[in-house]
From Swiss-Prot:
GO CC list: cytoplasm
Protein source organism: Listeria monocytogenes serotype 4a (strain HCC23)
Top-level taxonomy: Bacteria, Bacillati, Bacillota, Bacilli, Bacillales
UniProt name for this protein: 2-isopropylmalate synthase
Positions of region (Regulatory domain): 390-512
Function: Catalyzes the condensation of the acetyl group of acetyl-CoA with 3-methyl-2-oxobutanoate (2-ketoisovalerate) to form 3-carboxy-3-hydroxy-4-methylpentanoate (2-isopropylmalate).
Gene behind this protein: leuA
């Protein structure tokens, strides 16, 4: 039975999703959960792209102990050197180098001839091989590349020392039949095919990312690249949870095994959904809210008699456990810590102390503390502790003629208090206009989403906003509070703080 490696690029390609920007603490938290999930390789970022991304890759490389960490690099010596520096503390470092091979990319983006591309691949793969034991090469836009030239580029990379060849469907152009044939062609033409790990990197523009990834596995790929929940640029990437469960459920067909701990998918999905601000669609395969719901009477009757009639995946398989022990105001610190670890959170002693204090306050205010409340509690603590600004006071009042006024007081990181007031056509607009004055910013609100974390009158509100600055960069903010207006203010303030620090990495050419 063949072994399939899982390569997660949530922290690199997933973060290219408009409005998604993880800070260092969030990235480490995600990486630790991916390690617990059993991911073989974590792509931590693009070290050369910005000082912030370099520090993130460096921190993740130091934190991860049981899987490989890799960084992205162009065919540029400076990129490779920077990646080496960022990954020097990794237990098992790898590097991921890319260069486009399609005619449209070579002519209009790279402005390089085929000969120049081949020479660059040869030189830079050889250069990287002197620094890394595992070197992955990706011919960007492979599925739109001339087949003969693609094979020549791949052979050049292997001859120069590449140990992994990744085939990206950069724009989601291919289909399972064509993609499978591409791997068959590589198997036939590349003399070292069985000695090299071949991988797929698929995008979902035509809705076939998972199917294409599985077609690659059927035809010789031994590594699959993707993200949790399928997040990523445009329509997203291959959803790793779908591939992993498909390989498990249809082991009879694929004859493959993995290192994935399937019951960690729900925790992984929840964590990334909340930190990215991207809700999982209810009809999403494997981990969606309706994945195990049955509306039809005939289906319900069948499931009650025997779940196998209509369920091929049990909820418990992917970690959907509706019978978990509830926590309440009488729960102790040990029980709280255990639940946090089960949910994928690895808290320091001080973080645990602060979180438990907030939990006790929450338990006093609510009849029942649900798992969603606990996710929100940690998320709120993480976002607030990472901000340079803290909401200290909010007052909203009716002015005249339907106009609302807002007074907002903010504490800066050094403790300085700043306060201002403004009006708007509604309470939210008044609050946001006031924050704009305080932050001296000119930004556009592009998305505002509010949801109740749980049912009931004592539910907390969770607000997600996306703002766009004058350069076009987008930033995501989260706010959680029992009061909707306070949650809205916290979310907008957090997004504004991110735009001030420019936490979104620079816009670089990437394997998409």
């Amino acid at each position: 039975m063949k072994k399939i490696q899982f390569f997660d690029t949530t922290l690199r390609d997933g973060e290219q999703t408009p409005g998604v920007n993880f800070d260092v603490k969030e990235k480490i938290q995600i990486a630790l959960q991916l390690e617990k999930l059993g991911i073989d390789v974590i792509e931590a970022g693009f070290p050369i792209s910005s000082p912030g991304d370099f520090e993130c890759v460096k921190a993740i490389a130091k934190a991860i102990k049981h899987c490989s960490v890799t960084g992205l690099a162009r065919c540029v010596e400076g990129d490779i050197d920077r990646a080496e520096e960022a990954l020097k503390d990794a237990v098992s470092p790898q590097i991921h180098i890319f260069l486009a091979t399609s005619d449209v990319h070579m002519e209009y983006k790279l402005k390089m001839s085929r000969a120049e591309v081949l020479a660059s691949i040869k030189h830079h793969i050889s250069y990287a091989r002197q620094k890394f034991e595992v070197v992955q090469f990706s011919p960007e836009d492979a599925t739109r590349s001339d087949r003969a030239f693609l094979i020549e580029a791949v052979q050049t990379a292997i001859d120069a020392g590449a140990t992994v060849i990744n085939i990206p469907d950069t724009v989601g152009y291919t289909n399972p039949t064509e993609f499978g044939q591409l791997f068959q062609d590589l198997r036939r033409e590349i003399k070292q095919f069985d000695d090299i790990i071949f991988a797929s990197h698929c995008h979902d523009d035509l809705g076939m990312a998972t199917a294409n990834a599985l077609a690659a596995i059927e035809n010789g790929a031994r590594r699959v690249e993707g993200t949790i929940n399928g997040i990523g640029e445009r329509a997203g990437n291959t959803a790793l949870e779908e591939v992993a469960v498909a390989l498990h459920i249809r082991k009879d067909f694929y004859q493959a095994e993995t290192n994935i701990v399937l019951n960690q998918f729900k925790n992984s999905s929840d964590l990334i959904s909340r930190l990215s601000g991207m809700p999982v669609p209810r009809n999403k395969a494997v981990i969606g809210g309706n994945a195990y719901a049955h509306e039809s009477g005939i289906h319900q009757d069948g499931v009650l008699k025997n779940p196998d009639t209509y369920e091929i995946i049990t909820p418990a398989l992917v970690g959907v456990d509706k019978n978990s022990l509830p926590l309440g105001k009488l729960s102790g610190k040990h029980a709280f810590q255990t639940r946090m670890e089960e949910m994928g959170y690895n808290l320091s002693e001080q973080e645990l102390k602060d979180a438990f204090k907030r939990f006790k306050q929450l338990a006093d205010a609510k009849k029942e503390v649900t798992e969603d409340d606990l996710h929100a509690l940690i998320l709120g603590q993480s976002s607030e502790s990472a901000d340079d600004f803290e909401l200290k006071h909010l007052q909203v009042q009716y002015v005249t003629g339907g106009v609302q006024g807002a007074i907002v007081r903010i504490a800066e990181r050094d403790g300085t208090l700043i306060e201002d007031a403004a009006t708007g056509s509604g309470s939210i607009e008044a609050i946001y206009n006031t924050i704009n004055r305080l932050m001296k910013q000119n930004i556009e609100l592009t998305n505002y989403h509010i949801q109740a974390i749980t049912a009931g009158q004592d539910a907390q509100a969770e607000v997600h906003v996306v703002i766009k600055d004058k350069s076009g960069a987008e930033f995501h903010g989260i706010g959680i509070d029992f009061d909707v207006l306070t949650a809205s203010a916290k979310a907008y303030l957090q997004a504004s703080a991110k735009s001030k620090t420019g936490s979104k990495q620079a816009d670089f050419e990437e394997v998409k």
